[in-house]
Amino acid sequence: MRRMLIVAALAATASVASAQPVPVTLSEWKIGMKSDTVKAGPVTFRVTNEGGMNHAFYVRGEGVDQGTKQIPVRQSASLTVTLKPGTYEVYCSMSDESHKLAGMSRKLVVTPDNAPAAPKPPDA
């Protein structure tokens, strides 16, 4: 039994280590991400609160319903999830969803792992 727990813990650690990083910024009233498309598999959202109040980051869809705790102003948090191909919603889950309703919501499209990556938008 102990050996199985160690193997499971190592597999989880390897999954986090190999996860594709997705930087996210939160501020009033938007979620900033370089792309709305990621490849299927483990994804680590690295979320930074650049706003003037607490925020939180949530991912929902295709069997995933997870998020961060409250992220204080100028602080960061990470969330690692395994995403299957499909469409997800990412949003700020603070309060009574008032942040989400104020515009802190966007769609995230997850493509199969072997699909070509979406082109990056040109730098402004």
Model features per residue range: what roles?
Residues 63-69:
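Surface-exposed loop/edge segments in extracytoplasmic proteins
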Residues 56-60:
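Beta-strand signatures of extracellular beta-sandwich domains
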Residues 49-51:
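Asparagine-centered strand-capping/turn motif at beta-strand->loop junctions
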Residues 37, 80-85:
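Short, flexible loop/turn segments at beta-strand junctions in immunoglobulin-like
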Residues 19-27, 73, 78, 82, ...:
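Extracytoplasmic/periplasmic copper-protein system
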Residues 43, 86-90:
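A short tyrosine-centered beta-strand micro-motif
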Residues 4-14:
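Sec-dependent N-terminal signal peptides
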Residues 20-40:
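N-terminal edge beta-strand
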